[in-house]
Amino acid sequence: VEFEGMNQMVVPTLIDYLFKKVLRPSIVWPAFVYNYPKTMQPLARQNDENPTIVEQFQLVVNGWEIIKAYSELVDPMIQKANFDAQAKAREMWDEEATSGDDDFVLAMEYAMPPQSGFGMWIERTFSLLTGQENLRDVVLFPLMKSVKKDEPQS
């Protein structure tokens, strides 16, 4: 697979792009995707048996990410190293890389309990349940365009 801009991407961005544009659209039936490379999720906890992957999964249905969940990384030393790696990747033109957060790392140094979380796309779930192909047809609270004061309202 080749595409424009491929040679300028750093490895995590390339993996993410290939997953989203090549693999994920081919997943029709519900599937859990897990064993993500550590470089893909700097805020997730490393797997105890294999430190090259993180404790994360996604539920993918009909090519859409419905749920994303992971165990949170709570080790401040590892998190600082991850933020440093992200900063270096950002310098190498990786637009997806996050900048470090020293306040977050400082808070972690005071101790954080083990934790995890998940995000669920309600609109995508409604689209699947109602057979809609366009997310705009099921958005619960669509953004409204601002009306300028000098424009007539209908």
Tell what function each PLM region has.
Residues 1-66, 85-112, 151-154:
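Metal-assisted phosphate- and nucleotidyl-transfer catalytic regions
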Residues 76-130, 135-152:
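Active-site pocket scaffolds in enzymes
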Residues 33, 69, 121, 125:
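Hydrophobic, well-ordered secondary-structure elements that form the walls
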Residues 72:
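Active-site environment of non-heme Fe oxygenases that use a 2-His-1-carboxylate facial triad
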